[in-house]
């Protein structure tokens, strides 16, 4: 697949990337796409998946857990441990 077609993936929002990825999955599952086109859209799907994962990692890094003291007063924030 052309580099410029994959490069535009880097500018997509999470919502747009996931929407396009879902569309690609449906097309591939349908089984009516010629082999060459299947390979090309699969490659784009991989790029979209990586973009979504990247955006999710960035969002997780921005989420913080609010910490409180014994009386319930907010004392600050710390990174949220989601594992």
Swiss-Prot record:
GO terms for biological process: DNA catabolic process. Belongs to the XseB family. It is found in: Cytoplasm. Gene3D superfamilies: Exonuclease VII, small subunit. One of its GO terms (molecular function) is exodeoxyribonuclease VII activity. This is Exodeoxyribonuclease 7 small subunit. Bidirectionally degrades single-stranded DNA into large acid-insoluble oligonucleotides, which are then degraded further into small acid-soluble oligonucleotides. It catalyses: Exonucleolytic cleavage in either 5'- to 3'- or 3'- to 5'-direction to yield nucleoside 5'-phosphates. The lineage of its organism: Bacteria, Pseudomonadati, Pseudomonadota, Alphaproteobacteria, Hyphomicrobiales. Heterooligomer composed of large and small subunits. GO terms for cellular component: cytosol; exodeoxyribonuclease VII complex. Its EC number is 3.1.11.6. Keywords: Cytoplasm, Exonuclease, Hydrolase, Nuclease. The gene is xseB. It comes from the Bacteria.
